[in-house]
């Protein structure tokens, strides 16, 4: 199994720019082109929320067109910038597993050595996350049904504070309910989130919990400064690979850079310098 995991694309309406100057649509189209050109091709691409910026139909039209050009199966979940009904209307054709209920978008993928569980942590009218009773009950049933098979959850909001002064106040408000499932089910070993626009990792019991960078703009990690900074530091995604019984995640740059070159020991340490 190999998954490419991106997040927080924040598509805008055609011709509009994010914050008035960031061409997110062009940048995301470039990301799609890079993913389509990967030498080691993923089995699927995951997008963990905030697909669009303002929840408008025109933004979802752009998102569907650009994300629809990916040459891989696509797994999508909404974030706090998304409109649930419009998300489902425009993007369900790209991810039919989401079902037809905008208030209960979730799915389980059991095609790999690790079970993949996708849930919606967004709540209309707020940037904070929330897990409904139905979502918790569904997760509990899925984890019980999966037995000892390892399970990974993809959601938008991190379920616990990460020491980020800007983003912690808008994390998942009742994430403790998910952490209680981590305690009950040893098979739940990973939780991957978007939302924070930065690569952050922590651990709760046996579960690795991580957020990842956005595809275009990033949010610097600050422990004390609550001012809402963002920047255009190089974007990246995560690649998740099943290696035997191990799950290995690594960062893949989405910036344009020179290389790669084949390693040559004679150039690395020339004979005359030995």
Swiss-Prot record:
Gene3D superfamilies, A to Z: GpdQ, beta-strand dimerisation domain, GpdQ, catalytic alpha/beta sandwich domain
Reactions that this protein is recorded to catalyse: a sn-glycero-3-phosphodiester + H2O = an alcohol + sn-glycerol 3-phosphate + H(+); sn-glycero-3-phosphoethanolamine + H2O = ethanolamine + sn-glycerol 3-phosphate + H(+)
Biotech utility: Is of interest for its potential application as a bioremediator in the destruction of organophosphate pesticides and in the detoxification of nerve agents. The Ser127Ala mutant, which possesses improved metal binding abilities, has been immobilized on magnetite nanoparticles and shown to be active for multiple cycles, and could be stored over a prolonged time in the immobilized form without loss of activity. This system has the potential to be of potential use in the bioremediation of organophosphate contaminated waterways.
Enzyme Commission (EC) number: 3.1.4.46
Residues engaged in binding Fe cation 2: 50, 80, 156, 195
pH dependence: Optimum pH is 5.0 for mono- and diesters hydrolysis.
Record note on cofactor: Binds 2 Fe(2+) ions per subunit. Active in the presence of various divalent cations such as Fe(2+), Zn(2+), Cd(2+), Co(2+) and Mn(2+). Fe(2+) is probably the native metal ion.
Name under which the protein is recorded: Glycerophosphodiester phosphodiesterase GpdQ
Gene designation: gpdQ
């Amino acid at each position: 199994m190999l998954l490419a995991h991106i997040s927080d694309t924040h598509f805008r309406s055609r011709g509009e720019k994010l914050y008035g100057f960031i061409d997110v649509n062009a940048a995301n189209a470039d990301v799609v082109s890079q993913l389509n050109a990967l030498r080691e091709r993923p089995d699927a691409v995951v997008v963990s929320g905030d697909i669009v910026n303002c929840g408008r139909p025109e933004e979802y039209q752009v998102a569907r067109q650009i994300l629809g050009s990916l040459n891989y199966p696509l797994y999508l979940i909404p974030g706090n910038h998304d409109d649930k009904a419009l998300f489902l209307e425009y993007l369900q054709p790209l991810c039919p597993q989401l079902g037809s209920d905008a208030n209960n978008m979730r799915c389980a993928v059991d095609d790999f050595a690790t079970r993949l569980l996708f849930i919606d942590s967004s709540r209309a009218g707020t940037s904070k996350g929330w897990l409904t009773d139905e979502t918790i009950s569904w997760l509990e049933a899925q984890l019980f049904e999966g037995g000892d098979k390892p399970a990974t959850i993809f959601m938008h909001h991190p379920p616990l504070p990460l020491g980020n002064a800007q983003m912690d106040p808008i994390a998942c408000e009742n994430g403790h309910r998910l952490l209680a499932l981590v305690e009950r089910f040893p098979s739940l070993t990973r939780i991957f989130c978007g939302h924070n626009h930065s690569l952050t990792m922590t651990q709760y019991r046996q579960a690795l919990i991580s957020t990842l960078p956005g595809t275009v703009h990033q949010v610097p990690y600050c422990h004390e400064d609550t001012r809402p900074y963002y920047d255009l530091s190089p974007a990246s995604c995560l690649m998740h690979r099943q290696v035997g019984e191990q799950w290995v995640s690594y960062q893949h740059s989405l910036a344009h850079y020179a290389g790669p070159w084949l390693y040559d020991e004679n150039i690395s340490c020339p004979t005359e310098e030995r």
